[in-house]
Amino acid sequence: MIYLDYAATTPICEEALTVYQKLSMDMYGNASSLHDAGGKAKHILEYCREKIANIIGGEASGIYFTSGGTESNFLAIQSLLNGLPKTKRHFITTAMEHQSIHNCAAFLEQQGYDVTVIEPNEYGLITEEILLTHIRPETGLVSIQHANSETGIIQPIQHLSSYLHNKGILLHCDAVQTFGKIPINTKNLGVDALSMSSHKIHGPKGVGAVYIRPDVPWKPVYPLTTHEYGFRAGTVNVPGIGAFTAAAELIVSEMEKQISRNEALRTYFLDQIRIRSLPVTLAADTSKAECLPHIIGCFFHSFEGQYVMLECNRSNICISTGSACSAGYHGPSETMKALRKTEQEALQFIRISFGRHTTAEQLEQLLHTFTVLWEQKKGEFDIDRRIKANGRQQA
């Protein structure tokens, strides 16, 4: 099988799996228990907290472990809003966010919060000017993704955070697609909170983390909770967190090399698209917006993305038509709508995403599949033209 859907999830690496197995066998104590088994688990937990904090340039006291990106987003947003004055009940997010953010926004509206969903500019970027038109005195929190999971477009978070802080507004950033893929420093970005996920970086599923600056006030979603310093209820998954940390340390150690590999693979793929005259165009204008090199969101014109994905699957190649969390929905994604794509264009969208095990040979197989599909389609066009020509002659 050729797997080219790393933006959806990744296979667990051997290092993380080894740590998970060892901790499951040797450090099975509840980290909240006062006996030695609990103390050993607590020591591992705090060690992992320190390591994850170091990776993002944060403080260990600001790291809270969760069950993954979706829960990280929800708990971060809700906890920050809970900590704000009652006069700050206006929440802003963008049309291009992960579905978990949209779901959270809908839930906030049910609680009586005022929610504004802003559109990016034509290049998929949120600008200071766009924020300016929507910020109000009661705006308390803004949530903007670091990079889009479908297009790879990276938002200018550092610039936006400075602007928001000057207005006294907190900024949460969903960094699930960028953590471990590009350098992240919370101080440089200027974010107040950051969401991360394990299974996007070759760690186990069911684990994630939130970083909240220690000086930022928040109040828990779950009342009377003691786990994770009151941030999240339930017995802490120490083996999963240990494996997540092992995966994070490994991927960060390989980051520079992997970025170069991804850039080379991306260049090769796009060059071959042009050489073969395939009707494939990028969803993002890379001359106007910086993009993650391992994500190629594109349109295969004359084909529905779902059809291309299924044909690739028949050839034992895994690609995507967008976010896996919205895979059951057959229609234009919110990101495509935000980029002003027509419904026809949006339905032609496919996503190819690279990872640690991706090779040029695998991309060659994908290109071959694309070429076969296009040759078949051109043959159909020729038949249609002949039929129409014969019809005109008979008339």
Curated annotation (Swiss-Prot):
The keyword Transferase applies. One of its GO terms (molecular function) is cysteine desulfurase activity. Disruption phenotype: Cells lacking this gene require nicotinic acid for growth. Keywords: Iron, Iron-sulfur, Metal-binding, Pyridoxal phosphate, Transferase. [2Fe-2S] cluster binds at residue 325. Induction: Repressed in the presence of nicotinic acid. InterPro entries: Aminotrans_V_dom (IPR000192), Aminotrans_V_PyrdxlP_BS (IPR020578), Cysteine_dSase (IPR016454), PyrdxlP-dep_Trfase (IPR015424), PyrdxlP-dep_Trfase_major (IPR015421), PyrdxlP-dep_Trfase_small (IPR015422). This is Putative cysteine desulfurase NifS. The gene is nifS.
